[in-house]
């Protein structure tokens, strides 16, 4: 279930090309990594943003009601999820990822999970792989990883994906 990709954005492009049509909407949290914005628009899809909200302590949180509303209103069946989040740096807790995946499942939405920053978390924070939180996440998520952030190897462009569902993988 692990295979090579020509960079995370190359992998994202491959998934967009295989599972969406030009003009389809893709759900993306904002603020968003500029690479996602360019890749989605260059592939001909449109972006529907679900803004992250700061709570009373200044911690970025997902707005699950907004996600659900946007998925339904725009008939979205593919979302990009960034964990840890880029550019906010937020390391999502298991319960937050579980709740996001419940929203995606309710809307029959596939998920691209960019986990390229998974090795770089501050003390007291632990990266939870998206595919580990429930069965839906395990079977409906394209998870992307790369050594480029951890080991400063961006020039090598290599990355890999983990896809457990053989239909999605093939």
Question: In which residue ranges do the predicted regions lie?
Answer:
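Short, Asp-centered acidic motifs that coordinate Mg2+ and/or phosphate
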Residues: 77-78, 110, 142
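Active-site PLP attachment segment
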Residues: 133-170
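Alpha-helix termination/capping residues and helix-transition junctions
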Residues: 20, 73, 110, 135-138, ...
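Conserved core of the PLP fold type I
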Residues: 1-102, 119-123, 127-132
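Residue-level marker for buried hydrophobic side chains located in beta-strands
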Residues: 83, 111-112
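Conserved Rossmann-like nucleotide-binding pocket used by diverse enzymes
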Residues: 48, 112, 143
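A short helix->loop->beta-strand "cap" motif at the edges of active sites that frequently abuts
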Residues: 24, 45, 104-110, 138-139
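Walker B catalytic acidic pair
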Residues: 115
């Amino acid at each position: 279930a692990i295979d090579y990709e020509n960079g995370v954005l190359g992998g994202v492009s491959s998934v967009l090309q295989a599972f969406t049509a030009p003009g389809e909407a893709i759900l993306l949290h904002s603020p968003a990594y500029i690479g996602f914005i360019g890749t989605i628009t260059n592939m001909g899809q449109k972006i529907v943003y679900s803004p992250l909200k700061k709570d009373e302590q200044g911690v970025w949180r997902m707005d699950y009601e907004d996600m659900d509303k946007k998925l339904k209103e725009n008939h979205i069946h593919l979302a990009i999820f960034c964990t840890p989040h880029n550019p906010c740096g937020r390391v999502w807790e298991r319960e937050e990822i579980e709740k996001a995946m419940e929203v995606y499942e309710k809307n029959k939405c596939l998920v691209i999970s960019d986990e390229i920053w998974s090795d770089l978390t501050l003390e007291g924070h632990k990266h939870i792989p998206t595919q580990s939180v429930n069965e839906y996440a395990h079977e409906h998520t394209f998870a992307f990883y790369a050594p480029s952030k951890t080991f400063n190897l961006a020039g090598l462009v290599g990355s890999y994906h983990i896809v457990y569902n053989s239909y999605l993988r093939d």
